[in-house]
Amino acid sequence: LKHFNFKAMFSMDYASNNGRTYLPVMEVYDDTAAGDVVTLGTGKTEVSQFKENETKVQSDYLLTYTNSFDHGNHNLTATAGFTTYYNSLSRLDGARKQGVGLVIPDDPDKWFVSIGDAATATNGSTQWERTTVSMLARVIYNYKGKYLFNGSFRRDGSSAFSYTGNEWQNFFSLGGGWLMTEEEFMKDIKWLDMLKIKASYGTLGNQNLDRAYPAEPLLSNAYSAVFGKPSIIYPGYQLSYLPNPNLRWEKVEAWEAGFETNVLRNRLHFEGVYYKKRTKDLLAEVPGISGTVPGIGNLGEIENMGVEMAASWRDQIGDWGYSVSANLTTIKNKVKSLVQDGY
């Protein structure tokens, strides 16, 4: 179709990692011990193995419409898209110590957990999946190349907030610019090549967490206990971390205003921006209790503000060209709060 362009992109990254570890019997000199030698640890050789597979899949589907109207005075670009991201990991670990009198040899061909004493076997595993889905739209418009507008909207969903009812969140941005040097009243200023005033406001989110299921209560092994007559050993379990069924997206609101200019036949470029960013529902760790690993909560609000400036000079002298640049950034950080009801 005329004025339309469709783009589909797909990528996949698969990684497989496996390894083996051998722990020999370690002996150290000790002149106070019999034979002047002390054996460290259990005094048994040990082997361990692990295998880990990780998959990452990204897909993007973008439909773009581009057109100009009224002899090129009105220029429009509109994009609609759908993106997905999937990440999964699976890991299995195992270890065994030697049997009585059966030393595991220091030979990589024999470093397998099946060679050790089955009574000393230990194992563990890790498995998780994460998915992000986004629907987005963007519009870019300019009138005669001097009045510039853009706007975007996206709806993001993340499996990090599964079971909370807060999987989906909307975000948007608006921006505008004025290329003043395209105005008739600026044409007589010969040393000023370009001057643009710009401003924008937008929101975005963060769902990056160091665990896959922060809202779900996961159990891990703990100390065993003995009960009853005859005595029976019961395995113990504890919460791996404090689950949070109310967890939601971290949200960032940001706005900035500034200008860009080129002078002296475009040799000198300068730009300055004042910005302010406020992060709400900050994802942070909740202090652990009773020995548990800290959980994750939306605990605070942080505000950043400052100025960004950059300047560059570029020139040509005969066949020799050179450029010089410098930049300056200031930031004022303020923690507005680090508290939430219930903590």
Task: Report the location of each language-model feature.
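Extracellular/periplasmic, surface-exposed regions of secreted and cell-surface proteins
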Residues: L1-L23, A34-Y343
